[in-house]
């Protein structure tokens, strides 16, 4: 009777403490199955059996047989993944900003024996451990890093929980931060900082665009000048090559004409033909001067055409300054030279008409 009264009093105290803390253990809500000798354990559950108050064994899923009176099912542990909402709590960052943060915890019981005898309420213990670990990890980071390094923060919390909860037979699979609430003033300052950062980026992008545009324009002008100079260079080279070709062609033609003329002069009466040609050109030059300009070069006797022809032939002889090839004798060459000297002396001065 005293034992029953003590157990009843303990149950009432436990229920009162549970109601005061706002949590309900899973084992208390579902109750424990009775020993009916033949038991069927559901899949993904582990029943902890005590014999005469001491741990006896863990019932596996399926058919199991127990001894009446001696054996008692003391704990029922679920081996499924358990989802626990971590209540919202306050935490202070490295730069002394107070945050309100909550999360979701995913865990699984790996050892039913440790989960039954290692801790009174494993779920509640893990929840409290997650809260303390989260406060500790947030104290190592500044406010900006809390938002940037959210994944690494979750991983650090999981590692810390697994190290502490190993003796409880529980493994934390993952932890996710749900919401992070900052004070209104801090939120306003963060918004201003974001706007300033955006304006800064816009200004930088605009300046970079202007810079690239100026570079492109300068590069275009440079390329245009280079292409223009190369085109001018090519044009000058082509023009010079054309002029050189023309000069060479004229020189070749003139040389060929001189060779032909020299060959003609060596023939019979070639000197006489050359003298006649020079005389004709001499007379033609005087006629052109009279047509093109008011300046006229008058011979000593303009009415005597014969004297003009003689003067022209004298000029021809002076230019040759040598006996004409094919002449009959040297006396004729001397006579031509004398005639040239006389003709040169008879040339008149330039007079204005």
From Swiss-Prot:
Purpose of the protein: Mitochondrial protein that probably regulates the biogenesis and the activity of mitochondria. Stimulates cardiolipin biosynthesis, binds cardiolipin-enriched membranes where it recruits and stabilizes some proteins including prohibitin and may therefore act in the organization of functional microdomains in mitochondrial membranes. Through regulation of the mitochondrial function may play a role into several biological processes including cell migration, cell proliferation, T-cell activation, calcium homeostasis and cellular response to stress.
Coiled coil start-end: 215-252
Localization per Swiss-Prot or TrEMBL: Cell membrane; Mitochondrion; Mitochondrion inner membrane; Mitochondrion intermembrane space
Subunit structure, as described in the record: Forms homooligomers. Interacts with MFN2; may form heterooligomers. Interacts with PHB1 and PHB2; recruits them to cardiolipin-enriched mitochondrial membranes and stabilizes them. Interacts with CACNA2D2.
InterPro entries hit by this protein: Band7/mec-2_domain, Band_7, Band_7/SPFH_dom_sf, STML2-like_C, Stomatin_HflK_fam
Modified residues (Phosphotyrosine): 124
Cellular component GO terms held in the UniProt record: actin cytoskeleton; immunological synapse; membrane raft; mitochondrial inner membrane; mitochondrial intermembrane space; mitochondrion; plasma membrane
Positions of region (Disordered): 324-353
Modified residues (N6-acetyllysine): 145, 233
Gene Ontology MF: a single term: GTPase binding
Membrane topology listed for this record: Peripheral membrane protein; Lipid-anchor
Transit peptide per record: 1-28
Family per record: Belongs to the band 7/mec-2 family.
Residues recorded with modification N6-succinyllysine: 145
Modified positions (Phosphoserine) in chain numbering: 17, 330
One example of a Gene Ontology biological process annotation: T cell receptor signaling pathway
Family annotation (Gene3D superfamilies): Band 7 domain
Pfam families referenced in this protein's UniProt entry, alphabetically: Band_7, Band_7_C
The protein's name: Stomatin-like protein 2, mitochondrial
Source domain of life: Eukaryota
Alphabetically ordered keywords of this record: Acetylation, Cell membrane, Coiled coil, Cytoplasm, Cytoskeleton, Lipid-binding, Lipoprotein, Membrane, Mitochondrion, Mitochondrion inner membrane, Phosphoprotein, Transit peptide
């Amino acid at each position: 009777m005293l034992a029953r009264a003590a157990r009843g009093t303990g149950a009432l105290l436990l229920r009162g403490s549970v109601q005061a803390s706002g949590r309900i253990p899973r084992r208390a809500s579902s109750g424990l199955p009775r020993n009916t000798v033949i038991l069927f354990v559901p899949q993904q559950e582990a029943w902890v059996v005590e014999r005469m108050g001491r741990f006896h064994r863990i019932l596996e899923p399926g058919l199991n047989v127990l001894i009446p009176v001696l054996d008692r099912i003391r704990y029922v542990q679920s081996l499924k993944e358990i989802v626990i909402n971590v209540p919202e709590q306050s935490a202070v960052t490295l730069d002394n900003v107070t945050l309100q943060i909550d999360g979701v915890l995913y865990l699984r019981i790996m050892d039913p024996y440790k989960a039954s005898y290692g801790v009174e309420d494993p779920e509640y213990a893990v929840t409290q451990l997650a809260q303390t670990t989260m406060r500790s990890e947030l104290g190592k980071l500044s406010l900006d890093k809390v938002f940037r390094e959210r994944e690494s923060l979750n991983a650090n919390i999981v590692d810390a929980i697994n190290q502490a909860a190993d003796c409880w037979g529980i493994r934390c699979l993952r932890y996710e931060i749900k919401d992070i609430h900052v004070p209104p003033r801090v939120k306003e300052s963060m918004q201003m900082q974001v706007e300033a950062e955006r304006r800064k980026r816009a200004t930088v992008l605009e300046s970079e665009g202007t810079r690239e545009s100026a570079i492109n324009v300068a590069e275009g002008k440079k390329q245009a000048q280079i292409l223009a100079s190369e085109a001018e260079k090519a044009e000058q080279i082509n023009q010079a090559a054309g002029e050189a070709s023309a000069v060479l062609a004229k020189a070749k033609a003139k040389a060929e004409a001189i060779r032909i003329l020299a060959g003609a002069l060596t023939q019979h009466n070639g000197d006489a033909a050359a003298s006649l040609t020079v005389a004709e050109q001499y007379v033609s030059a005087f006629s052109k001067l009279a047509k093109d300009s008011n300046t006229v070069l008058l011979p000593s006797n303009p009415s005597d055409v014969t004297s003009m022809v003689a003067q022209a032939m004298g000029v021809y002889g002076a230019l040759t300054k040598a006996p004409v090839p094919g002449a009959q004798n040297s006396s004729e060459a001397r006579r031509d030279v004398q005639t040239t000297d006389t003709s040169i002396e008879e040339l008149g001065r330039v007079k204005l008409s």
